[in-house]
Amino acid sequence: MGPFVRILQVIHQFPPYSSQGSEVYCYNLSKWLSARDDVRVFHVSNTARRRPHRLTRETYDGLQTLHCVDGGEYSRIADWPNAFLREAFQMALDECAPEIVHFHNFVSLGDDLVSTARASGAAVVYTLHDFGLICPNMYLLRTDGKLCDKEDPEFFQDCCPVLVRTNGGSRPVLGARVPSLARWRVYANQQPRPALRMALKAAVGVAEQLGGDPAHTDVARKRDFFMTQTRRIFRDADLFLAPSEFLRQRYVSCGVPSEKIVYTRYGMRPFSRVAREGATERLAFGYIGALHAQKGVELLLEAFRGLGDRADLHIYGSAFGSPISENYWRRINDGQETSVVFHGAYDNQRIGAILGSLDVVVVPSLWYENSPLTIQEAFIGGVPVITANRGGMAELVRDGVDGLHFRLGDAADLREKMLHLVEHRDV
């Protein structure tokens, strides 16, 4: 390699189109590397456009990006393979001639880009931001809300059946334009108006009766389809980076050779906390992150209702234009007291000021998490964290030292921990 390295970052979405955890990390890493190396970012947007199926060259904050505009609706791995994305990615490889291709996610990217990158002669690195290569639902979280303790690649429960297609054939034209029943079911469940929610759920039920319930399809066929694709990724990547030891152990138990996967904590962008002026009588709790059901915002609101007027809860997050997330927020926030303040989307460059306005950050996720950037940002800003006692969250937060643990999914226990801090502010 020469005095600089040609690096192609690959991720499902990227700012300014989306700025959630893995996208922010990819952006910060790319900015840092670009001070010395030739760094470009290949990403996808499934936002409907007038001219979909094209590869555009753009610039975001000085970073060169190759934006693959597909305009499709994706249900994760149900859409493998994607010939257009494969062709666009090959164009990016030919244009950039990278020495290193660094993957961050495969949602909406198809199953064969890792193999395509390897065939180009580049070294292939894959940072594991979630459990997507061993779980079709990405979170090791069943659709009934229970955690999955998967530690065997052959263990494949039918807990997320609608996300896995049992063959690699093309979808019919109508199916390409209509969201899957899985999406309609989620959309129905998160409708804020009860009458509309019941009507949509009934319609989805009729559609499942007529077209067959995906939950009754052959688990073995879906397991074989899923694991065939992911084993190829295990084989063709040169190195996997695991930001938590918990995640590393899960991947090793499910087939990644231990010598190919390294535990390394996320590198973080330094920033200064902007302290607020004057003390406040009420403790300020904060949630910073996406408004997705598995993030536990509903659990946090339930716990907070027991605090009365002794604290405030500030929620920083965005639905990013998603009707599902927007409806979810309207439903769970219906009738909330004024001590809950929803700030909406935030610019991560303001994280120092946001943390400066908070006394405690709460990470109430219902899944294991990996190595939440929010927790690490809170620690940089000197803010303690209350989080669940499982997975990567518990690994980061030392109970009673730099934060508190509560029993995952237990609103009463979370309320107890929040009350403890309200009543003992000097802790």
Predicted segments, located by residue:
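N-terminal subdomain of nucleotide-sugar transferases
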Residues: 1-54, 61-64, 94-96, 120-123, ...
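A conserved mid-protein helix/loop that constitutes part of the nucleotide-sugar donor-binding site
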Residues: 24, 292-306
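Donor nucleotide-sugar binding/catalytic pocket of nucleotide-sugar-dependent glycosyltransferases
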Residues: 133, 153-273
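Glycosyltransferase donor-sugar binding loop
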Residues: 312-329
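Nucleotide-activated donor-binding/catalytic signature segment of Leloir-type glycosyltransferases, i.e.
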Residues: 326-349
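Short alpha-helical segment that forms part of, or immediately flanks, the ligand-binding pocket
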Residues: 352, 370, 375-380, 394-395, ...
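Short hydrophobic beta-strand element within catalytic cores of glycosyltransferases
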Residues: 363, 375, 384-387
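Conserved acidic donor-binding segment of nucleotide-sugar-dependent glycosyltransferases
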Residues: 399-400, 404-411, 420-426
